[in-house]
């Protein structure tokens, strides 16, 4: 199994690479790519960790050598948020970066499963889909927006609030990956209940958690370490499913049946070809249903922005 990380010299990419070097199955290959000249050195640094995962680093304009033979590609390349910015302010820079990298994926490893971490995910996934479609290699079961950070934050915050072990809480999060489009389904956590006020406040905290980190870092960046952990969890789940493990379920932002929007984050059963089944979002509370209805315009606009970036 070969996993490529694009944007591997950045804060998320280095954290992700460290976790993958430690946790990928024995015999896996990990290839790191970034435009920054430090990238081969990051790979050498990680190569000293005694795990049976081969690692190589590549830098420069051309990601092709890193992508050859990749089964999974995780893209974290791009600029990070600064205080006062929201994820959509990143669009102008990051849209072009994602387009360029996905064009290289389309040529070099068109059958790979691709996880997009680069913000704004609501939009960059639509860009990636349109690029792959133009190249004639788009498979909607193999393109994912990585929203796992919303899930792990939800798990943490719920456990704190309710005095549970964080490892025992699993919150499904649906919708998109910014602001109001992030919808944790708090009503679906077994054995935990919330007052309406708790649910509203917790939902808001989960939606604004990225800003919490941006402000706490005081201009020094955005969520890199927790995002690295989230991306590693998703990437490792994908690898396990591709290798034939049964019953692997993760939420991610994918193209579905279009019931809510062209792309929508929902629980997915993963398998040997990527998405095996898009699972139902189940029964929502009145608060969740209202939040879902209220976000769809925003989500659809975000998606349209990505489609237009490629098609206009």
From Swiss-Prot:
Protein name per the record: Malate dehydrogenase
Organism: Salmonella newport (strain SL254)
Keyword Phosphoprotein: no
Binding site for substrate: 81, 87, 119, 153
Family matches, as PANTHER family: MALATE AND LACTATE DEHYDROGENASE, MALATE DEHYDROGENASE, MITOCHONDRIAL
TM ranges: none
Protein origin, superkingdom: Bacteria
Signal peptide limits: none
